[in-house]
Amino acid sequence: MKNLRLTVLAGGTGSAKFIRGLAKIFPQKNLSVIVNVGDNIKIYGLIICPDLDTIMYMFSNMLNKEKGWGVKEDTFNFQKMLKKYGLETWFKLGDKDLATHIYRTFLLQKGYSLTEATKILSKSLSVKAKILPATNQWIETKIVTKTGKIHFQEFWVKKQAKPKVLNVTYEGIKKAKPT
């Protein structure tokens, strides 16, 4: 098994648990993970990639395993300050996690692709596995409800998946090319 290479398609917190199990059998350097980007969202001008980050934090032993997302032992001073400014804070971004989003956004603004930015972030966190976004193009999963179309994260996190789903759309999918 030490020489066997494995590629996994991943998305969401369940994938991190599955891959954590695989990482006990296979060396990290033998694992490639192609990760969902349809849940990515822009918040406060930052590019947030929840599924990529969950996998990256899992491999770097930084993942908050209780929640299944975010960085363990993270603080939320950034969120508290935003709340004082009167901004919505339904999408929880920890202070350490925030550094990831700031750095990723900086790299993307400098012209790096999402694949390149993910490689740089992963290397900085000593991740040996190859983590690849499914595409470098921007895709958004939108949920259509009675009140209109909302981003998947707003549906899942802010509204706790309560509205009745009438349809699901994937904006940008037709222009997306595999990584």
Residue ranges and their predicted role:
Residues 1, 179:
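Glycine-rich phosphate/diphosphate-binding loops that line cofactor/substrate pockets in enzymes
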Residues 2-6:
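Extreme N-terminal starter segment of soluble prokaryotic enzymes
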Residues 7-13:
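Short, glycine-rich nucleotide/cofactor-binding loops
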Residues 8, 33-34:
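Structural beta-sheet core signal
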Residues 13-14, 34:
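Short glycine-rich anion-binding loops that position phosphate/pyrophosphate groups of nucleotides
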Residues 14-19, 41-44:
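Short N-terminal binding/cap micro-motifs at the start of the first secondary-structure element
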Residues 17-30:
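A short, Lys/Arg-enriched amphipathic alpha-helix followed by its capping loop at the start of a domain
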Residues 36-178:
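Electropositive, gly/pro-rich neighborhoods at or near active sites that engage anionic ligands
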